[in-house]
């Protein structure tokens, strides 16, 4: 913001920033009411010309703090599991598992806000409320993701979409939402399959 802008021009900008801060606060309060969630999802991916390039379905779960589960069952199976420390990406077809540092992997995406509660993570994004949805945008210009929209119905997450920097829009519609139970907690503990190649990228950053 240029120092030479007069107070008249600054006033609406300061008001706008205050509104954005309130929107972020509302989203945090809504998420604070969701300690855990498990749901089925249907995925539709469209390109920059709004042409459908992929559809899919699977199971999605999250729990505070920093636990995440993503199991795409169709059309091709893949799995992402975060236990709060490490993030595991499993491709059964390629028989490969990639292991990443959780903080490094998830912090690159606005989806991080669904499982993070700390101020440092939230300060990296701007939040704008639009009816029952919140648009989350990374402040970094090289994030790879342009925006994420998360939508709620009576306080329950029911859909979200992710727009990348190439114009591809991934839309996810959730159903059968409920809090995780004792048995569901096992979802956040990845069991390494036998006879798979392991690419441990944690070692490369140490």
UniProtKB/Swiss-Prot annotation:
Residues making up the signal peptide according to the UniProt record: 1-21
Key words, A-Z: Chaperone, Periplasm, Protein transport, Signal, Transport
Any GO BP annotation: lipoprotein localization to outer membrane
SUPFAM superfamilies assigned to the protein according to its UniProt record, in alphabetical order: Prokaryotic lipoproteins and lipoprotein localization factors
Location within or outside the cell: Periplasm
InterPro entries to which the protein is assigned, alphabetical: LolA/LolB/LppX, OM_lipoprot_carrier_LolA-like, OM_lipoprot_carrier_LolA_Pbac
GO cellular component terms attached to this protein's record: outer membrane-bounded periplasmic space
Chief place where the protein resides: periplasm
Presence of keyword Calcium: no
Summary of the function given for this chain in its UniProt record: Participates in the translocation of lipoproteins from the inner membrane to the outer membrane. Only forms a complex with a lipoprotein if the residue after the N-terminal Cys is not an aspartate (The Asp acts as a targeting signal to indicate that the lipoprotein should stay in the inner membrane).
NCBIfam families referenced in this protein's UniProt entry, alphabetically: lolA (TIGR00547)
Family statement: Belongs to the LolA family.
Assembly behavior: Monomer.
Name of the featured protein: Outer-membrane lipoprotein carrier protein
Organism for this UniProt entry: Shewanella sp. (strain MR-4)
């Amino acid at each position: 913001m240029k120092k030479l802008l007069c107070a008249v021009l600054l006033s609406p900008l300061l008001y706008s920033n205050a509104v954005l801060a309130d929107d972020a606060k509302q989203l945090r309060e809504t998420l604070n009411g969701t300690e855990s969630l498990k749901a089925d999802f249907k995925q539709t991916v469209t390109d920059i010309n709004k042409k459908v390039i992929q559809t899919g379905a699977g199971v999605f779960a999250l729990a505070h703090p920093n636990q995440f589960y993503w199991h795409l069952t169709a059309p091709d199976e893949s799995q992402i599991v975060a236990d709060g420390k490490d993030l595991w990406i499993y491709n059964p077809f390629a028989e490969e598992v990639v292991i990443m540092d959780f903080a490094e992997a998830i912090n690159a995406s606005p989806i991080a806000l669904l499982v993070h509660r700390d101020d440092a993570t939230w300060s990296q994004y701007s939040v704008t409320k639009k009816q029952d949805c919140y648009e989350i945008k990374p402040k970094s210009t090289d994030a790879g993701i342009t925006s994420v929209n998360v939508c709620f119905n009576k306080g329950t997450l029911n859909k979200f979409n992710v727009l990348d920097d190439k114009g591809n829009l991934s839309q996810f519609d959730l159903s059968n939402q409920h809090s995780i139970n004792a048995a569901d907690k096992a979802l956040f503990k990845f069991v390494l399959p036998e006879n798979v190649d392991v690419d441990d990228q944690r070692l490369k950053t140490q």
